[in-house]
């Protein structure tokens, strides 16, 4: 029996079965290798504030690359030029634009775009172009929506809660009190190095700094007003009196008004002869006096 069992174990398996057991199953995705890129554009980041209609429009244009970071990818103007080349292929050539990150490349690309806009009599605010070049928060999204309306003649409802003021004031007000910027940090964050290189005018930069300082002071006042306990702000004398005004003070005021009205009424008197007299209070040169008339 033992020999028979050993013989059964030593029997060769069929060719089909041996091939199945000998060859390991290949993994679905080889380890260490990235899957092949699909033709579908990747999903936009959650921080993107573009509407769905604008995102679908960008996907339908079949651009050379999809803008995953709207603030960064539209700053050099290459994608903007590519969008205009799709709509006006005979007036603009994409080969004259360069997809780079240097300030010189950005200024050259946007200078060509501005010439094209002036030729076609299209109007794009220069503030939006300036904010897009220097990566101001929220500005590229507004610029893309303006281009979408300009080319498709369709108005969209903006999904941004607040207007862009080219600073991070709204973002700082949403933060807790501790991690908010100081004045020096606010100046560093809101004035880019590219702005100083493109516009080295000292006077304009000083005006920007003064505006940021005033904005920081306003933010500080609002923080103290909204969070008095954090800053240990004590109430003023007027606030204390309003909060602790006694209830009987209103009764005194009402009584004083009633007594004044009674004093204003004419009082009738009679003299020794029995003739009735009426006292009339007359105000002359600021001093009250009594005038009597015989009836």
UniProtKB/Swiss-Prot annotation:
Compositional bias of kind Polar residues: 284-295
Pfam families: CH_2
Compositional bias segments (type: Basic and acidic residues): 270-282
Disulfide bonds: none
Cellular compartment(s): Nucleus
Chief subcellular location: nucleus
Tissue specificity as recorded in UniProt: Testis.
Domain Calponin-homology (CH): 48-154
Gene3D superfamilies the UniProt entry points to: Calponin-like domain
InterPro entries registered for this protein in UniProt: CH_2, CH_dom, CH_dom_sf, Spermatogenesis_Ciliary_MAP
Keywords for this protein: Nucleus
GO cellular component, one term: cytoplasm
Region feature (Disordered): 1-34, 251-295
PANTHER family found in the cross-reference section: SPERMATOGENESIS-ASSOCIATED 4-RELATED (PTHR12509), SPERMATOGENESIS-ASSOCIATED PROTEIN 4 (PTHR12509:SF8)
Function: May play a role in apoptosis regulation.
Name listed for the protein in its UniProt record: Spermatogenesis-associated protein 4
Gene name of the record: Spata4
């Amino acid at each position: 029996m033992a020999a028979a069992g050993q013989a059964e174990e030593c029997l060769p398996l069929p060719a089909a079965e041996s091939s199945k057991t000998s060859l390991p199953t290949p993994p679905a995705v080889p380890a260490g290798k990235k899957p092949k890129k699909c033709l579908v554009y990747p999903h936009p980041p959650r921080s993107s504030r573009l509407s769905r209609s604008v995102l679908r429009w960008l996907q339908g244009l079949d651009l050379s690359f999809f803008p995953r970071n709207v603030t960064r990818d539209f700053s050099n103007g290459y994608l903007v030029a590519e969008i205009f080349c799709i709509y006006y292929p005979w007036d603009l050539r994409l080969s004259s634009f360069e997809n780079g990150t240097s300030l010189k490349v950005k200024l050259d690309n946007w200078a060509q775009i501005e010439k094209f806009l002036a030729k076609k009599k299209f109007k794009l605010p220069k503030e939006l172009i300036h904010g897009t070049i220097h990566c101001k928060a929220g500005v590229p999204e507004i610029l893309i929506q303006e281009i979408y309306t300009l080319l498709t003649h369709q108005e969209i409802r903006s999904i941004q809660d607040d207007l862009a003021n080219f600073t991070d004031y709204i973002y700082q007000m949403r933060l807790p009190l501790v991690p908010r910027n100081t004045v020096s940090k606010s100046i560093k964050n809101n004035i880019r190095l590219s702005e100083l290189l493109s516009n080295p005018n000292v006077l304009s930069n000083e005006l920007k700094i003064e505006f940021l300082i005033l904005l920081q002071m306003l933010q500080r006042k609002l923080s103290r007003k909204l969070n008095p306990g954090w800053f240990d702000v004590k109430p003023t004398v007027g606030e204390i009196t309003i909060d602790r005004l006694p209830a009987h003070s209103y009764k005194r005021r009402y009584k004083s008004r009633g007594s004044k009205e009674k004093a204003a009424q004419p009082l009738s008197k009679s003299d020794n002869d029995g003739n009735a007299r009426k006292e009339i209070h007359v105000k002359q040169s600021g001093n009250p006096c009594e005038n009597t008339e015989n009836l």
